[in-house]
Every structure is written in C-alpha cells, then in structure tokens.
C-alpha cells in the first residue's frame, strides 16, 4: 500500500514538473531587463556535457528576432534565431562561456537598449582576451520582456571597442 501511494505521489510530481508550460518554466527569465539579460548569457554558456537550451533561448526572444554579427571590416551577417541553432545542433557542444563584463541599460517606456561587453572563455574561471560588444534591443509586452534583436562586434587589434566601453564612466 505504501509503495502504491509513493508511486502515485511520484507520478503526480513528475506530471506537474514536465507538464509546465514555457510561460511557467521561464517566467522569471523575462520579468525584468536584468533577468532577461542574465538568461541570455546563461542559455549560451555551459560545459560540453550540458545540453543546449534552445527552448529557453527561443522563449526569451521575440518571434522574429534578428541576430547581426559585424566582422572586423564592419560588414554585417544578419540572420534569424532559428538559423543560429542549426550549426550549434549539428556539431558537438564544447565548453563555452560568455561572461558579461559590463552592461549599460537605457530604458524608456516599453523599449530598452542594452550595451553589453562580454568575454568568451572555455573555463568560466579563467579569463581570456576574446571579447566583444553586444547591442541588444528589447520591448515589453503582455507582462514580460522580449529580445527583438542583437548586434555583436568582436574586439580586434584595429578595433578596441570593448576596452573603450569598459573605460567609459
């Protein structure tokens, strides 16, 4: 009898955990600008043993989010979030940590613009010299924040944008 009751309780607990909607699972990620930016860095970072968090990443972005990368000559490579996932899903995951170094937020009404400097590491505790700057646009709708787009440029020998951004007051 005790075994049956224990199994029933375990079954109900599993159903309630796995039956959560995305809104229930990731609601805290989108309640503030800080929360969504922390989730943004969290979903991309992790060890090679951790699975990609595609569902969570998709949830924090708006449906038609655009990603733009600038090369060292200023040329753009715009694409959708879904096309970002394709190469990630096709190759084995490696240890990768995008660590935020500094954030500047401008927030007016339901709009926000975030400048965020980051460093790419293969170990979260060992600094690296691979750095970049994100420009992230967000909007607030239906009680939550969405990332609409982000543009990234990596620091290079001829463009010290992260150093300049970190040295700003």
List the predicted regions and their residue ranges.
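A mature extracytoplasmic/lumenal domain signature
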Residues: 71, 116-118, 151
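Hydrophobic pocket/interface hotspot
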Residues: 40, 55-57, 65, 114, ...
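Bacterial Sec-dependent N-terminal signal peptides
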Residues: 1-24
